[in-house]
Amino acid sequence: MAIGEADPWRLQYFEGIPCPDGIDIPTEDADAWIWFPQHRWIYDKLAIAQSQGIAAAPHGVVPPRFPVFSKPMMNLRGMGIGSRVIASPQEYAAALTPGHFWMELLEGEHISTDVAVENGRAVWWRHATGIPRPGGTFDRWVIYAEPRPQLEAACGTWIASHLAGYTGMMNLETIGGRIIEAHLRFADQWPDLYGDGWVEAVIGLYANGVWSYADTARSTGFSMVLFAPSGPRYRHPEAGILAALRERSGISSIQITFHEDWDPSRHAMPPGGFRLAIVNCHDLGAGRAVRAELREALAEAMQPEILYLKGAA
């Protein structure tokens, strides 16, 4: 298997699919940074902003106006670590951090887009938006069947201008049609929701340099996220319970997204909670029901003093 996947709960999407020797397909930014040195500059978020004429500069350069958005120039762990809005010069002076930068505070829809790229030309798109909750957490992601022609045109032009010669998958995060982050990989949280044969098409893109995927049966999907309070050491639910839930109509897959033998602090998590599970589905009602049952199962696996998980939203 040449698909580099660090999270064991996501290997289910790639196991058993043949992949030629010598082909490296990243799902982790650290791998992509190593494997694609010519294009690794895109992990510099300050460079991404400047490539589009977005007002931005390293900490130490005072913004001409507030509020601004501040974050690390480079963060390969994700989860929005170190990101925040800075509202005033006084707050900015107190928040100065080496390796961070500020950028103008963008407005508009926040979209995550997976793109297949052939030699610097975007040839396939799929878009998703998150339903946020406090503290950088999410209730769910909606993976849309519909295209976004205006966004695709703008991002396609940027890709052609800045990634000549690149062949592979990309993930772009945009706000109001402007790119805030770019990744040399796809979103490995929901590849099953893209349809049968999609992973094989990705392998073909890296192996042969050609994207070949009919994509004739698109349907909107949902990636339901289960968060709980940070701090406790959670345990996995029983395998039999998981197997039964995976068989429910409308459910595509279930991920238990933590290592129960790790100290909780080793996991990269947003400030608002600890992510326990993800339910991918095409039926929103079924996904909500299975997520609720997962919450109960995870609570039953815990010690009595933290059974409050049963009441978590």
Language model features with spans:
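N-terminal pre-catalytic "stem/leader" segment of glycosyltransferase-like enzymes
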Residues: 1-39
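Active-site nucleotide/adenylate-binding loops and adjacent lid/helix of ATP-dependent enzymes
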Residues: 27-158, 292
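Peripheral (often C-terminal) accessory segments that flank ATP-dependent C-N-forming ligase machineries
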Residues: 52, 204-313
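Short secondary-structure junctions
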Residues: 55-56, 97, 163-166, 246-254
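Residues at beta-strand starts and edge strands
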Residues: 66, 109-111, 168-170, 220, ...
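Short, flexible/disordered intra-domain loops and linkers
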Residues: 77-82, 192-194, 233-237
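ATP-dependent carboxylate/phosphate-activation module, predominantly the ATP-grasp catalytic core
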Residues: 107-110, 115-164, 176-225
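A short glycine-rich, hydrophobically flanked beta-strand micro-motif that places a catalytic Asp/Glu
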Residues: 164-177, 257-258
